[in-house]
UniProtKB/Swiss-Prot annotation:
InterPro entries assigned: ATP_synth_b/b'su_bac/chlpt
Family classification: Belongs to the ATPase B chain family.
Subunit structure, as described in the record: F-type ATPases have 2 components, F(1) - the catalytic core - and F(0) - the membrane proton channel. F(1) has five subunits: alpha(3), beta(3), gamma(1), delta(1), epsilon(1). F(0) has four main subunits: a(1), b(1), b'(1) and c(10-14). The alpha and beta chains form an alternating ring which encloses part of the gamma chain. F(1) is attached to F(0) by a central stalk formed by the gamma and epsilon chains, while a peripheral stalk is formed by the delta, b and b' chains.
Transmembrane region(s): 22-41
The keyword S-adenosyl-L-methionine appears for this protein: no
Signal peptide: none
Organism: Prochlorococcus marinus subsp. pastoris (strain CCMP1986 / NIES-2087 / MED4)
A GO-annotated cellular component: plasma membrane-derived thylakoid membrane
Pfam families: ATP-synt_B
Protein name: ATP synthase subunit b
Subcellular localization, as worded in the UniProt entry: Cellular thylakoid membrane
Length: 170
């Protein structure tokens, strides 16, 4: 058997520095020096460009989100201002309606009271007048209590129209 001869034939990598050819080592080192930086450089450059692109995209989205937030804040403040104005207007209108209703109720009570004095059934008329007054006051109080929660523009206009029609009928 010739085992030492078998080990020296064929392709193999000899890592013993003293037994290898210095020229082979120089070719390998030059190849690594020449091609490895270009290969790694291209990979790193592509990765860097990808990261920069993602950062720019994220900055653009942040800018858009910031602009949308500012617009939403502006819209909210305008809506709050408009709601405050509507509430103030509805309170003014409800107060004027209440005052007008009270005035009409007082005038009506005075008329009823005057006719009750001259009439035989003045006691019954006074009781009815008192009940009407209390009913009107209770209805006005109840309406005023529930008015801010339910009163929008169209409902308010309908209420004013109904009140005027009711007063004109009486």
């Amino acid at each position: 058997m010739n085992l030492p001869l078998l080990a020296t034939e064929g392709f193999g990598l000899n890592l013993n520095l003293f037994e290898t050819n210095v020229l082979n080592w120089a070719v390998v080192v030059f190849g690594l020096y020449k091609f490895l930086p270009g290969f790694l450089g291209k990979m790193l450059q592509k990765r860097r460009e990808g990261i920069l692109l993602e950062l720019k995209d994220a900055e653009d989205r942040l800018l858009k989100a910031t602009q949308a937030l500012e617009k939403a804040k502006t819209d909210l403040s305008l809506a709050e201002e408009k709601a405050g104005q509507i509430k103030a207007d509805s309170l003014k209108r409800s107060e004027s309606i209440r005052m007008e209703s009270e005035k009409k109720a007082i005038e009506e009570m005075a008329r009823i009271k005057q006719s009750a004095i001259s009439d035989e059934s003045s006691e019954a008329s006074r009781a009815i007048s008192q009940l009407r007054k209390e009913a009107v006051e209770l209805a006005i109080k109840k309406a005023l209590d529930s008015l801010p929660n339910r009163l929008d523009q169209t409902t308010q206009e309908n209420l004013v129209t109904q009140s005027i029609n009711n007063i004109e009928m009486n």
